[in-house]
């Protein structure tokens, strides 16, 4: 009976995501992914056929995971507790490299963000979260980034509460 390739494929994808988290798009090579996955480069190509395909799969994984984690955090509590949870998730993503990978992939056009905007309020929420992610990933002092985060959410609440 042939061996199930699913775990190997998943391991390679996880290694690709980790490679992007550590080095961004600049550090993404098939050799680096293979080393991190503990396989030979040929096996990476066997499962994904090209660097581009693997990169697109990793970009989709990062975008989906990032979005789900931020939505979970925002929905974890009402009011400011949900915003605080979202802030902590943004900090976590800045620390684990997810923000760096997401910024790098978005800048390269590998993550399509146009479909997610359902209206002004949704677009404004995404802009707040994404802007703060960029600030954290680029080294803006934590207190300054948090002040901006709080001010932007308060402004959005004020604007959307007006008749």
Q: Where would I find each of the regions flagged by the language model?
A:
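N-terminal intrinsically disordered/low-complexity leader segments
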Residues: 1-7, 161-163
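Helix-turn-helix
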Residues: 11, 15-57
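Solvent-exposed, amphipathic alpha-helical segments
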Residues: 11, 15-23, 68-73, 101-109, ...
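Amphipathic alpha-helical interaction segments
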Residues: 11, 53, 81, 85, ...
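Hydrophobic alpha-helical connector segments
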Residues: 57, 68-99, 125
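Short, basic, alpha-helical segments at the C-terminal edge of helix-turn-helix-like DNA-binding modules
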Residues: 60-66
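Helix-loop "lid/cap" segments that line or gate small-molecule binding pockets
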Residues: 88-93, 100-114
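Hydrophobic/aromatic-rich alpha-helical bundle segments in the mid-to-C-terminal region
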Residues: 113-163
